[in-house]
Design a protein with these regions (language model features):
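Short hydrophobic/aromatic-enriched beta-strand-loop microsegments
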Residues: 55-61, 121-126, 163-166
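Short internal alpha-helix immediately C-terminal to a glycine-rich phosphate-binding loop
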Residues: 22-24, 127-135
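Short, thiol/selenol-centered motifs that function as redox-active sites or metal-ligating centers
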Residues: 12-22, 39-47, 146-152
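Flexible, polar/low-complexity N-terminal or interdomain linker segments that lie immediately upstream
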Residues: 3-10, 28-30, 53-54, 58-115
Length: 166
């Protein structure tokens, strides 16, 4: 068991709420303190790890017990966190993406994709993106989508850091 300074109950919440609550809770911690987030959303595994990395906090890891994910994040220097965070604005509607040339990249979990997706969209769940970027063509325009925009924003940031410019 990992020692934490503060516990956050995000059980029963779906994306983006575990991240929203985590961000708020992290604001109340001092540098070096560890937050334990308890969540039941399977997407939280990839979402919280990616968010932590994006904003400069240390994602320590996740344990699962009886369908509850216990995530552990250590707060790092807030000046670094603010400097790293960057949002990408929506550039096209889902309907527009279907008509355009390029790749529609769906970063939702496989189960979410199975229940409904844009025809022709490529599914690479957020948690697999770093290992599967080689499946994408840097020369093509990539439209990144998810359910709420949170994961697609994080994915767009990861792609930009990896040299994807379209």
């Amino acid at each position: 068991m990992i020692k934490s300074d503060v516990q956050l109950d995000a059980k029963g919440l779906a994306c983006p709420m575990p991240i929203v609550k985590t961000k708020k809770a992290m604001g109340n911690l001092t540098e070096g303190q560890v937050l334990e987030i308890q969540a039941t959303d399977k997407g939280s595994v990839a979402d919280l790890a990616a968010w932590s990395k994006t904003v400069g906090h240390q994602y320590i890891g996740t344990n699962e017990e009886n369908g509850v994910f216990y995530h552990y994040i250590r707060k790092c220097n807030p000046e670094v966190s603010e400097a790293v965070e960057k949002s990408f604005e929506q550039t096209i509607s889902n309907e527009g993406a279907i008509k355009e040339e390029g790749i529609i990249l769906d970063v939702r979990e496989a189960a979410e994709y199975a229940f409904g997706h844009i025809p022709g969209a490529k599914s690479i769940p957020m948690g697999e993106l770093s290992e599967r970027m080689n499946e994408l063509d840097k020369a093509q325009t990539i439209y990144v989508i998810c359910r709420t925009g949170t994961r697609s924003d994080l994915a767009a940031q990861q792609l930009a850091k990896a040299g994807f410019t379209n």
